[in-house]
UniProtKB/Swiss-Prot annotation:
The keyword rRNA processing applies. One of its GO terms (biological process) is rRNA processing. Zn(2+) binds at residues 128, 132, 138. Keywords: Cytoplasm, Endonuclease, Hydrolase, Metal-binding, Nuclease, Ribosome biogenesis, rRNA processing, Zinc. This is Endoribonuclease YbeY. Its EC number is 3.1.-.-. NCBIfam families: rRNA maturation RNase YbeY. Single strand-specific metallo-endoribonuclease involved in late-stage 70S ribosome quality control and in maturation of the 3' terminus of the 16S rRNA.
């Protein structure tokens, strides 16, 4: 896998984000048995202001969010609950999966509210973003079930507890 990490907000520790991205993206590809290619992924570590601009520009939602993804290929399943099309290397040998942006502010806020470690939450959001690059989504109920099940399985391989279990406190 070829990973390019771009830091726009100095609060992100470049080495830590690169390590977390490497773990999350690699674990996702391995779980889906897609680790044979040199897939290319770019991760942008930014703040709420930048991700709000991106969210407004690409999704017409002018507010911050935790993570955004831009798949290089259209892989989404046509039917609710269907499997996405596997990614392919193009005729020029390009193995780009796409780009992910993650907001420091929203990530830290969500981790604190959920009483989870920031590191685990970052890895969760990067797994989530990578699944979006691979055609998975959570808009339709059947698709959401598949995506959440994959997230829980991948995070389990990373030693991270199920993020969808609600806990009362620390």
């Amino acid at each position: 896998m070829i990973l390019d990490v771009v830091i726009e907000d100095a609060r992100w520790d470049a080495a830590a984000l690169e390590k977390q991205a490497q773990e999350a993206v690699s674990a996702t590809l391995a779980y889906l048995e897609l680790e044979d290619e040199d897939w290319e992924v770019t991760v942008l570590g930014c703040d709420d202001a930048r991700i709000a601009d991106l969210n407004a520009e690409f999704r017409e939602k002018p507010k911050p969010t935790n993570v955004l993804s831009w798949p290089a290929q259209e892989l989404a399943a046509a039917q609710d609950g269907g499997q996405p099309t596997p990614p392919e290397v193009d005729f020029m040998g390009d193995a780009a999966l796409g780009d992910i942006a993650i907001s420091y502010d929203t990530c830290v806020k969500e981790a604190n509210l959920a009483h989870k470690s920031r590191e685990d939450h970052v890895r969760h959001l990067l797994v989530h973003g990578t699944l979006h690059l691979l055609g998975y989504d959570h808009i339709r109920d059947g698709d959401a079930t598949i995506m959440e099940t994959l997230e829980v399985g991948i995070l389990g391989k990373l030693g991270i507890p199920d993020p969808y279990i609600i806990e009362d406190g620390p």
